[in-house]
Amino acid sequence: MLHPLLRHLPLALALALCAAGAAQAKNLVVCTEASPEGFDIVQYTGAVTADASAETVFNRLLAFRPGTTEVIPGLAERWDVSADGLSYTFHLRPGVKFHTTDYFKPTRSLNADDVLWTFQRALDPKHPWHASALRGYAYFDAMGMGELIKSVEKVDELTVRFVLNRPEAPFLRDMAMPFASIYSAEYGDQLLAAGKQGQLNNQPIGTGPFVFKRYAKDAQVRYTANPDYYAGKPPIDNLVFAITLDPNVRMQKVRAGECQVSLYPKPEDVPRLKQDPNLAVDEIDALLTTYIAINTQHKPLDDPRVRQAINLALDKKAMLDAVFGPGAASPAVGPYPPTLLGYNHSIQDWPHDPERARALLKEAGAENLRITLFIRNGTSPTIPNPALAAQMLQADLAKAGIQLTIRSLEWGELLKRSKAGEHDLSLLGWAGDNGDPDNFLSPNLSCAAAESGENQARWCDKDFEALMRKAREVSDPAERAKLYEQAQVVFHEQAPWIPLAYPKLFNVRRNTVQGYVINPLSNNNFATTSVKP
């Protein structure tokens, strides 16, 4: 445990004192933008939570090549797919070790039982661990995995077979996503026997590059390098996520060397940061969408005319110029960026037309509309200045006769309340997890996701659902593209969102940091990162 005196010292100084006791310890401090919601990753969809668990503690059967959306082997060293696309057989790496900690000491290596435990926990309501996910299986349910997966079978100690009820084009990509992280069945059995199921969300065990040490909410998460990592021990010895909500403070810390990596600077600061000889700025056209979900279950927001009016009232260009700055984001028209399959370039964005908005509101009997917008109290790559965006929306809506109240909430609280349907509007962002269009649509716009609350527009449209489902089942890219183009027409006409932006992704690091790769999927993995003396 950290000495009481050290708790009151700045993070960098505390690390320096620790390093003095450990001579050549190599530390990496990353300034992150928010606290993780927990560490039982199957319960959550937030990118911050995935970085703190899936990218550090856990692995999946498959992985993405760093900096790309190419699927590569993970815990499975190879796989076979049946000719009918209904059977996927994964061959596990031998000798992969789970973490050894003060609270768990494994007696065996990874095997098929761990894969079965992981997926049957979510699939089977009678599984002894099923009810332990107090927030449910957010991604799993939103993507319809329960109805997709017919069975998960143990072929032998190192072979697992998934049998599907229907073909699923993005299934291999899905198996590389955070929600598919593989847990230790032995650790689960230990906690269950002790009646300590809640510990899984506070003290995770995985096979990943870093071993969890401790978490201080809104302060830091600490890890040590996994000496037994199957891909080789990471170059650094200690990894610290220093939770720093204010992007200005994050930049001050990286300039001062208190952090070696600082995530998500304000776009307007990027040109100045690039001029600092001690810093390097990484940027990429990421798979990101910024949007405002409109709660279609609240009257009169259940009327598409009202939702269209809200879209028409917004001066989107002015907002993007002010919030993101020149060249840092392009206007969003649909639910996913134009780099993905089936983006419909023929759809024209809603123009800024407050008079037409007023007319639609009058036609719908929704004049003098009063609604509430939820925003986060920190920043993120999808929305670098939530308060400014909210204020600009408020002013634009007022010109159309709509009174908007703004509520600023801590990120975890915003997600909790929005998923419970308390909002009228909620300012959100989505980071693609696998490079497939379905990853934007199913978790955020499907009927299953509306029921679970992940679809925060609570929009369930049978025509959209049918197109999306068919696109998942066909393997031909051209046919899938046509289906997605049609689905986007339905989305545009029904207007469950205000699509705002497709932002670029920026991260800042000291130029002594090597081996860090910025990812279009917005995940941050430090397994290969090193720091020069």
Curated annotation (Swiss-Prot):
Gene3D superfamilies: Dipeptide-binding Protein, Domain 1 (3.90.76.10), Dipeptide-binding Protein, Domain 3 (3.10.105.10), Periplasmic binding protein-like II (3.40.190.10). One of its GO terms (molecular function) is peptide transmembrane transporter activity. SUPFAM superfamilies: Periplasmic binding protein-like II. One of its GO terms (cellular component) is outer membrane-bounded periplasmic space. GO terms for biological process: dipeptide transport; protein transport. InterPro entries: Peptide/Ni-bd (IPR030678), SBP_5 (IPR039424), SBP_5_dom (IPR000914). Keywords: Peptide transport, Protein transport, Signal, Transport. Pfam families: SBP_bac_5. Residues 1-25 form the signal peptide. The complex is composed of two ATP-binding proteins (DppD and DppF), two transmembrane proteins (DppB and DppC) and a solute-binding protein (DppA4). Five orthologous SBPs (DppA1-A5) are present in P.aeruginosa, which increases the substrate specificity of the DppBCDF transporter. PANTHER family: D,D-DIPEPTIDE-BINDING PERIPLASMIC PROTEIN DDPA-RELATED, PERIPLASMIC BINDING COMPONENT OF ABC TRANSPORTER. Belongs to the bacterial solute-binding protein 5 family. Part of the ABC transporter DppABCDF involved in the uptake of various di/tripeptides. Prefers dipeptides with acidic residues at the C-terminal end. Efficiently uses tripeptides. This is Di/tripeptide-binding protein 4. It comes from Pseudomonas aeruginosa (strain UCBPP-PA14). The lineage of its organism: Bacteria, Pseudomonadati, Pseudomonadota, Gammaproteobacteria, Pseudomonadales.
